């Protein structure tokens, strides 16, 4: 067989052979001599005897063999090594395989050596022939190793099967291996004291003797224990061979354009999908395979969860979790907003600064798309510093207070517990043409006075909504404000229309009250007559106080008694609690600062200008009110509210609401009496309602933002009987609040939203323009830009 393999291996070599003198003598070889030099696959499969006796023959039909070989190679199968042996191709002439002759002689010698017998024939006890083979001596190339003659050959059988026998198995020759004798306890003690090298304390199950390790096994265990490489021939520090990156390829492997089939859906796949869809529709393919009997049987198998009873291991008492990294911001985005990108000046300042002084470790950049983002150069450094912080920096556990946010909010009472307050519209007052700019309820709570863009002042009966009196004060000028004189001893109505202030006594009261009202207004004429007449030069000055005059005959017949020419349009009127003084504010931008605020005395028919210069900061004045119990005048401009002591002529306090433009404010009626301090509410055109506690701070105590448009008017309930206040807004709604003020200095005011009242229509971007309360009931009246007034109960 060895000769056959050698001959086959030699025949696989196909190369051109040069002619040698020792092989050819110049004569041509006969076909008999060349038999076997060029053999096909059939000759390769001959036996050893045929191979040794084969002759050399010439291959006449070489072209046919080439065609057969070509046909075999044209197939999809790759010819094996055995099929390629002996196949010789030449375009012009056939080549003689002369090396085959030399190999043939060598194979003949090897076959003769193999023919030597490795056994002998002996006679057995019956006289028959018995073959006795010689022992095999393995060389270095053999896979067999020396077999220990005393080794146990019972295989993978437990030794407990031999417990009742005196032996424990058989050796390679079939002889019994006797059980080793066991030593006494003293011998075992001595063996444990004098431990030999390689002692393990275990028993070899195959021999029953103590198991001892060899020197090689001990060395292997030592290397494993020392974390060394067991194989001595292995080199862990071999030079790195970069198979794919050694040479940089500049040109692409293939520059062919992408074929169209890469972008067009495959028609063959579509056909296959349609076949599957058709099969599913016909029922030949079931998309949801029903459960088989085996699956149903698996349900009966009891399955156990290995981790069902696993208990979570508690953390170490000293364990402190690592703090989390802060989340990334907009500046770390690959496409940050433009305001986060630095300009040239900021970039240069960052580059010139020391790394320790820089605010951040990088500059925000805009890459446009994520695929253009390069590697971050400080990534490894930041991770290393993070590891150092986790490893070296001490950690502190800070316990957080688990406080319910709802518990921090004040306990507000339910609105149902705070009744009465207005909830619905009870009456609608119609009669004005255009917007109703102002309204006021008289101190008795019986009559309602209104003024509008049509220049008329109307008095209504509050309960029934019936109009009782009306007077037209101007043709083209609207009535900006109407206010009743406080007190029940007289019925005097002040109205501002155009540049004049009108004081009227409507004929609606009883004769005694009406006569007392007329006498109160007529008493000032005598005081005015006793004063010296002003000079013509002084009358031309703008800062000269105006002289009170009598109205025209038509107005006098209508009930108007006094006219005060201010020369500027007055926007607000506010009476003093005693009814002898009232203050007017001309908030126009063209009004001089010296005449913007005027205080009028009814008993003397006297007008005074307390401010000679404009109030600092905040623009022109907007409105003014007297304190309900102190000689203090509050004046509000666009941004601040100032409190002046009229008796001492000093600035007492400056209130800073923080609003952009103050529209109105009101003072709590019980300020400085039961409450122990002054409380204000301020409305602004920037949709904010602010509550001020002047004893607490100059800043707002509460800021309420419930309206969608500007707030036009705010008002406390007069008298302090009901802790209510309301505001009116251009969004067409009124909001009613509960505002309780106590005399306890340790408690603050309680503010509770109660009701939102809607009914006025928004006309010309204007909604509710004014609001007032009934003096005794929890009723309020509102004036709207839609030309109506509404009574809310």
Swiss-Prot record:
GO terms for biological process: maturation of 5.8S rRNA from tricistronic rRNA transcript (SSU-rRNA, 5.8S rRNA, LSU-rRNA); maturation of LSU-rRNA from tricistronic rRNA transcript (SSU-rRNA, 5.8S rRNA, LSU-rRNA). It comes from Emericella nidulans (strain FGSC A4 / ATCC 38163 / CBS 112.46 / NRRL 194 / M139). It comes from the Eukaryota. InterPro entries: BOP1/Erb1 (IPR028598), BOP1_N_dom (IPR012953), WD40/YVTN_repeat-like_dom_sf (IPR015943), WD40_repeat_CS (IPR019775), WD40_repeat_dom_sf (IPR036322), WD40_rpt (IPR001680). This is Ribosome biogenesis protein erb1. The lineage of its organism: Eukaryota, Fungi, Dikarya, Ascomycota, Pezizomycotina. Its main location: nucleus. Keywords: Nucleus, Repeat, Ribosome biogenesis, rRNA processing, WD repeat. Pfam families: BOP1NT, WD40. Residues 323-340 have a biased composition (Pro residues). It is found in: Nucleus, Nucleolus; Nucleus, Nucleoplasm. Component of the NOP7 complex, composed of erb1, nop7 and ytm1. The complex is held together by erb1, which interacts with nop7 via its N-terminal domain and with ytm1 via a high-affinity interaction between the seven-bladed beta-propeller domains of the 2 proteins. The NOP7 complex associates with the 66S pre-ribosome. Gene3D superfamilies: YVTN repeat-like/Quinoprotein amine dehydrogenase.
């Amino acid at each position: 067989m060895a000769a056959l393999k050698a001959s086959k291996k030699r025949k696989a070599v196909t190369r051109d052979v040069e002619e040698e003198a020792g092989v050819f003598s110049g004569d041509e070889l006969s076909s008999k001599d060349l038999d076997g030099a060029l053999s096909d696959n059939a000759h390769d499969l001959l036996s050893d005897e045929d191979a040794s006796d084969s002759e050399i023959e010439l291959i006449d039909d070489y072209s046919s063999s080439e065609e057969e070989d070509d046909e075999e190679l044209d197939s999809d199968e790759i010819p094996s090594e055995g099929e390629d042996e002996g196949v010789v191709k030449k375009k012009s002439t056939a080549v003689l395989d002369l090396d085959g002759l030399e190999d043939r002689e060598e194979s003949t010698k090897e076959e003769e050596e193999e023919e030597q017998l490795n056994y002998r024939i002996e006679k057995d006890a019956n006289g028959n022939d018995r073959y006795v083979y010689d022992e095999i001596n393995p060389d270095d190339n053999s896979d067999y190793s020396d077999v220990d003659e005393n080794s146990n050959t019972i295989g993978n059988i437990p030794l407990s099967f031999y417990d009742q026998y005196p032996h424990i198995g058989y050796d390679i020759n079939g002889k019994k291996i006797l059980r080793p004798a066991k030593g006494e306890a003293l011998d075992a003690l001595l063996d444990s004291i004098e431990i030999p090298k390689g002692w393990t304390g275990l028993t070899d199950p195959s021999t029953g003797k103590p198991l001892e390790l060899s020197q090689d096994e001990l060395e292997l265990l030592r290397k494993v224990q020392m974390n060394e490489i067991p194989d001595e021939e292995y080199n862990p520090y071999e030079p790195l061979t970069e198979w794919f990156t050694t040479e940089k390829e500049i040109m692409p492997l293939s520059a062919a354009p992408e074929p169209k089939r890469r972008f067009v859906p495959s028609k063959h796949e579509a056909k296959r999908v349609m076949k599957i869809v058709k099969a599913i529709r016909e029922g030949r393919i079931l998309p949801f395979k029903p459960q088989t009997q085996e699956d149903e049987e698996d349900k009966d198998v009891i399955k156990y969860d290995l981790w069902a009873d696993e208990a979570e291991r508690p953390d170490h008492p000293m364990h402190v979790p690592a703090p989390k990294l802060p989340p990334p911001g907009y500046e770390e985005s690959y496409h940050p907003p433009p305001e986060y990108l630095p300009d040239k000046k900021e970039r240069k300042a960052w580059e010139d600064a020391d790394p320790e002084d820089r605010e951040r470790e990088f500059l925000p950049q805009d890459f446009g798309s994520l695929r253009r983002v390069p590697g971050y150069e400080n990534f490894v450094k930041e991770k290393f510093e993070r590891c150092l912080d986790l490893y070296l920096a001490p950690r502190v556990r800070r316990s957080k207070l688990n406080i319910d946010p709802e518990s921090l909010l004040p306990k507000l009472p339910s609105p149902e517990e705070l009744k009465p307050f207005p909830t619905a519209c009870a009456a609608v007052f119609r009669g004005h043409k255009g917007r109703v700019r102002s309204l006021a309820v008289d101190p008795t709570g019986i009559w309602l006075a209104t003024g509008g863009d049509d220049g008329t002042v109307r008095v209504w009966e509050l309960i029934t909504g019936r109009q009782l009196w009306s007077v037209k004060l101007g043709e083209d000028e609207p009535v900006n404000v109407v206010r009743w004189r406080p007190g029940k001893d007289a019925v005097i109505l002040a109205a501002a229309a155009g540049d004049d202030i009108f004081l009227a006594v409507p004929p609606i009261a009883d004769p005694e009250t009406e006569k007392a009202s007329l006498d109160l207004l007529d008493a000032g004429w005598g005081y005015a007559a006793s004063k010296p007449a002003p000079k013509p030069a002084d009358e031309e000055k703008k800062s000269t106080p105006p002289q009170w005059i009598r109205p025209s005959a038509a107005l006098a017949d209508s009930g108007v008694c006094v006219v005060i020419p201010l020369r500027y349009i007055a926007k607000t009127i506010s009476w003093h609690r005693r009814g002898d003084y009232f203050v007017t504010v001309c908030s126009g931008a063209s009004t001089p600062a010296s005449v913007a605020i005027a205080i009028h005395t009814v008993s003397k028919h006297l007008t005074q200008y307390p401010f000679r210069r404009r109030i600092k900061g905040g623009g022109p004045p907007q409105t003014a009110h007297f304190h309900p119990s102190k000689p203090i005048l509050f004046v509000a401009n666009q941004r601040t509210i100032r409190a002046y002591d009229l008796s001492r002529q000093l600035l007492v306090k400056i209130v800073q609401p923080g609003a952009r433009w103050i529209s109105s404010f009101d003072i709590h009626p019980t300020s400085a009496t039961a409450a122990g301090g002054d409380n204000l509410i301020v409305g602004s055109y920037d949709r904010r309602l602010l509550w001020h506690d002047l004893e607490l701070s100059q800043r707002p105590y509460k800021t309420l933002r419930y309206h969608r448009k500007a707030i036009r008017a705010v008002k406390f309930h007069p008298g302090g009987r009901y802790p209510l206040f309301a505001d009116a807004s251009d969004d067409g709604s009124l909001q009613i609040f509960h505002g309780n003020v106590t005399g306890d200095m340790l408690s603050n005011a309680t503010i509770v939203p109660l009701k939102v009242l809607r009914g006025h229509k928004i006309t010309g971007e204007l909604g509710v323009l004014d609001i007032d309360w009934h003096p005794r009931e929890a009723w309020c009246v509102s004036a709207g830009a839609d030309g109506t007034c509404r009574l809310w109960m």
